[in-house]
Amino acid sequence: MATELQHGAAIEIDQLYKQFGKKNVLQGIDATIHGGEFVAVVGKSGCGKSTLLRHVAGLETATSGEVRQNGERIDGINQQACLMFQDSRLLPWQNVLTNVGVGLRLEGEWQRQAAALLKDVGLDGRGNDWPAVLSGGQKQRVALARALASGPKLLLLDEPLGALDALTRMEMQQLVERLWLIHRFTALLVTHDVSEAVMLADRIIVIEEGRIVMTKDVSLPRPRVPTAPGFADIQETILNELLGIQAEKPLLQQTN
């Protein structure tokens, strides 16, 4: 592997409030994420999940409360975290190798390291290509390699697979999981996709209107498939919460 990442960062979120104007976006969020854990945050659009991620990244200032990493308050940009977005945000005027090298600050033997990272994400030999010739999934592979380049202890994923087709999305889920299992960074994923959350996460946090309304452990063996025993039950539990359906009645019966 290109880089040896240390064990992931532990995150504590303590009574986090965020207000934009008169709108309360986060309302007393309390959560603990253990080092090396993979946690997914799910919720409807506008529930506050991406705002929460930005606070962990140090890109927002809380109205009150705080986020701590390994016991220290995060003030300013979190230097031990890297973000992946739905848009790969590659530099169109630089080739693929240099885009990955940005994560290495283009120092030392960055070209060798960047090439090794591209191999890790399944793009061996594509370093001289321009971003314009890559598919959406390939661009996200480059973005993942760039995110891993600095050896982050925390990988923040803001719906990075949301714009991909179903097959490419599955391939990327498998890649993210494989690299997480190897490097054991802490991963925090924001997604609308409940199936994706069950596929990847050790634990799922459900947010509604800026509050945590459910936390669900996912103890299924890895690698996971949607047809595995227990997968559909966990998915249905989360969907029932999001849709406001009483848990004692199966979702399919509720919708008939």
UniProtKB/Swiss-Prot annotation:
SMART domains: AAA. It is an enzyme of class 7 (translocase). Gene3D superfamilies: P-loop containing nucleotide triphosphate hydrolases (3.40.50.300). It is found in: Cell membrane. This is Aliphatic sulfonates import ATP-binding protein SsuB 2. PROSITE patterns: ABC_TRANSPORTER_1, ABC_TRANSPORTER_2, SSUB. Residues 11-234 form the ABC transporter domain. ATP binds at residues 43-50. The keyword Nucleotide-binding applies. CDD domains: ABC_NrtD_SsuB_transporters (cd03293). Part of the ABC transporter complex SsuABC involved in aliphatic sulfonates import. Responsible for energy coupling to the transport system. The lineage of its organism: Bacteria, Bacillati, Bacillota, Bacilli, Bacillales. It comes from Shouchella clausii (strain KSM-K16) (Alkalihalobacillus clausii). It comes from the Bacteria. It is a peripheral membrane protein. Its EC number is 7.6.2.14. GO terms for cellular component: plasma membrane. It holds the Pfam family ABC_tran. Keywords: ATP-binding, Cell membrane, Membrane, Nucleotide-binding, Translocase, Transport. The complex is composed of two ATP-binding proteins (SsuB), two transmembrane proteins (SsuC) and a solute-binding protein (SsuA). The keyword Cell membrane applies. One of its GO terms (molecular function) is ATP hydrolysis activity. It catalyses: ATP + H2O + aliphatic sulfonate-[sulfonate-binding protein]Side 1 = ADP + phosphate + aliphatic sulfonateSide 2 + [sulfonate-binding protein]Side 1. Belongs to the ABC transporter superfamily. Aliphatic sulfonates importer (TC 3.A.1.17.2) family.
